[in-house]
Structure formats: C-alpha cells, structure tokens
C-alpha cells in the first residue's frame, strides 16, 4: 500500500508503470554484465543509448573516464534552479551464487550492492522528466563510475 505522500503523485507512478518492464530489463542486463569502477564501457553505452531514447536535452560522456551525464530542462528552465540526481554504476569483485537467468556472466564480478538498480532507476527518472517536463529548472542526471 502506498503512503499518502506517494498517492499524491499517482500520475507520476502511473506514467512510470508504463515503462517499468523496460527498466527491469535494463537492470537485469546490467546485472548480467557487471564492470568494475572506471571500466564501465558497456554500462556507459547502455546508459547513453537509454538517455538518447528518453529524449534528454544533452548527453555528456567520458565524465571521470566512463561516466555519463544527462541534462533535462523543465518547462521553465530559465529560473536558474538546478538539481542533480546520481547513480553509481560499478560492480564488485565477488562471485555471484544465485541461478537467476540474469546472473553475472563475468567470473568473480557482480552487482552485489544494487548499482545496477540505481542505474536503471535513474534512467527511469530521466525518462519521466524528459517525457513530462513538469518541473521548473534543470535536472542533471549523473551516472557515476567508480563509487
């Protein structure tokens, strides 16, 4: 059951629910293809492509070597207001022991700390913000390599 605060944002949740399966697929793909800090080449490409498909206003890559930054301007971007949202993309050097179809395909490396989920959630935020633009200011979406 959603809290009253979340119910007030029912339109946002309904909108995001429309592309939730795509976010799950992205998270599972990233989980299956973990990369260590500052080696997130595949992850960076996937993020860049997802942001392009979302329709963000700007995409900057190679930030901190493998990081990606997306920029979305709201309906009133001239206000000078700006917010940054961040997700970390790197994996850990540990062996995955589950047997899910999306388990790590790389021996001794896995997303054991949720960074695949953080990345997918920030892509979801980027898509929602780009599709609705129902905010005042600019949102900067930072996909950080090497936490």
Question: How should these model regions be labeled?
Answer:
Residues 2-111, 120-123, 127-137:
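Acidic/His- and Gly-rich active-site-bordering loop/insert found
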Residues 89-91, 116, 142-147:
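Acidic, glycine-rich active-site loops and adjacent beta-strand->loop/helix elements
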């Amino acid at each position: 059951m959603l809290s009253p605060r979340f119910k007030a944002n029912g339109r946002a949740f309904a909108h995001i629910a429309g592309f939730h399966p795509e976010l799950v697929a992205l998270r599972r793909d990233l989980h299956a293809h973990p990369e260590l800090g500052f080696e997130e080449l595949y992850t960076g490409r996937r993020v860049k492509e997802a942001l392009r498909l979302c329709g963000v206003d700007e995409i900057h890559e190679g930030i901190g070597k493998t990081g990606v930054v997306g920029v979305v301007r709201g309906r009133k971007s001239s206000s000078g207001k700006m917010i940054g949202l961040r997700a970390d993309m790197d994996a850990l050097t540990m062996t995955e022991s589950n047997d899910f179809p999306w388990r790590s395909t790389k021996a001794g490396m896995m997303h054991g700390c949720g960074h695949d989920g953080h990345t997918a959630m920030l892509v979801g935020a980027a898509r929602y913000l780009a599709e609705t633009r129902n905010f005042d200011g600019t949102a900067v979406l930072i996909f950080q390599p090497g936490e």
